């Protein structure tokens, strides 16, 4: 096994990322630490515990002098108040015979932002896609272990994938609005689920209103901080929006089906700094109501927006999971310290 990231596995239907959208719709350590300090008032995280990270696979980057024995145990005993919204136990994921994730276990708290960081090819996007079974769409993908949403195994018998992806929405790296009007982008998901036709939407909104679609569109766009910018051109093609507006539209499209969890795979990596700041502000606002899980290569961004951070290292193993301030100010393994310091990645 080499450190070179594997090529992207092909989807089972060889379709583009737009089809994933359709399915989903139905730094430096100093800068990162500064962001944490600003967010937490300069308070360091909890004192560390025993914790050298796992990862005795040859492909896993390690600090000179660390032995296999020292790399046995990951520091992932992160404790938080309340129940887990998502609970992952002993998760292994394969593409054909190649293992992409190995023995990953962690609990994700509700109404918070969890960041997933690590070098390219470490498995963080694979992990994200396991949470709503988007990996089912990739040829040869196989998942072992347990992923529970509100204590129900999403890989168990009788799981309705359409309903699962409604509960666990996804926003992708590249903005991918449908080539339809802004209005139709928002109403696509509820129409697909039959909400507009059955009156479920009106009940969700707490009102019996014939203008349910209009209310839905406005509500979703307001939640995504986009309404004031587009309310006078809802009939325009969404492809005419700026990149940042398109990404917020995709977030609004996700919100329109009333999810519990929102997955974001590098949602700001293709955007300029101004648009990125708007997305970051939006993520923090969404966490007041939703459980948000974000993959990012930008460690400063992870430090700014997240409550807890999971660090994956090459080989698909979880190296460390803790409160974000602890990860950046007091990491429990040398490898994680080296990674957040930019010594490899």
Swiss-Prot record:
GO biological processes: phosphate ion transmembrane transport
Gene Ontology CC terms: plasma membrane
Biased composition (Basic and acidic residues): 8-18
UniProt cross-references to PANTHER family, sorted A to Z: ABC TRANSPORTER I FAMILY MEMBER 17
General function of this protein: Part of the ABC transporter complex PstSACB involved in phosphate import. Responsible for energy coupling to the transport system.
Subunit details: The complex is composed of two ATP-binding proteins (PstB), two transmembrane proteins (PstC and PstA) and a solute-binding protein (PstS).
Protein name as annotated: Phosphate import ATP-binding protein PstB 2
Organism: Halobacterium salinarum (strain ATCC 700922 / JCM 11081 / NRC-1)
């Amino acid at each position: 096994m080499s450190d070179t990231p594997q090529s992207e596995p092909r989807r089972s239907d060889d379709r583009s990322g737009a089809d994933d959208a359709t399915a989903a719709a139905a730094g430096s350590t100093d800068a990162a630490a500064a962001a944490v300090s600003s967010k937490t008032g300069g308070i360091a995280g909890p004192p560390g515990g025993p914790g050298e990270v796992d990862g005795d696979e040859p492909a896993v980057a390690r600090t000179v002098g660390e032995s296999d024995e020292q790399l046995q145990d990951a520091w992932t005993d992160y404790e938080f108040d309340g129940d887990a919204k998502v609970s992952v136990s002993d998760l292994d994921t394969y593409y054909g015979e190649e293992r992409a994730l190995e023995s990953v276990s962690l609990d994700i708290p509700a109404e918070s932002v969890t960041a997933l960081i690590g070098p390219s090819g470490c498995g963080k996007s694979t992990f994200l896609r396991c949470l709503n079974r988007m990996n089912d769409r990739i040829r040869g993908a196989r998942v072992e272990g347990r992923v529970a949403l509100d204590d129900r195994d999403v890989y168990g018998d009788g799981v309705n994938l359409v309903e699962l992806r409604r509960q666990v929405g996804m926003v992708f790296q590249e903005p991918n609005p449908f080539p339809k009007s802004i209005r139709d982008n928002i109403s696509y998901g509820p129409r697909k689920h039959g909400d507009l036709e059955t009156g479920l939407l009106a009940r969700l909104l707490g009102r019996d209103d014939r203008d349910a679609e209009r209310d839905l569109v406005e509500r979703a766009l307001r939640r995504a901080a986009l309404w004031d910018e587009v309310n006078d051109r809802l009939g325009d093609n969404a492809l005419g929006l700026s990149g940042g507006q398109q990404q917020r539209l995709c977030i609004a499209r996700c919100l329109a089906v009333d999810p519990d969890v929102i997955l974001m795979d590098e949602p700001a990596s293709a955007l300029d700094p101004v648009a990125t700041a708007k997305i970051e502000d939006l993520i923090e606002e969404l966490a007041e109501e939703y459980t948000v899980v974000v993959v990012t290569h930008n460690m400063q961004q992870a430090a700014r927006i997240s409550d807890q951070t999971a660090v994956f290292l090459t080989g698909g193993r979880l190296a460390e999971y803790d409160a974000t301030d602890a990860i950046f100010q007091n990491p429990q393994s040398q490898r994680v310290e080296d990674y957040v310091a930019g010594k490899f990645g």
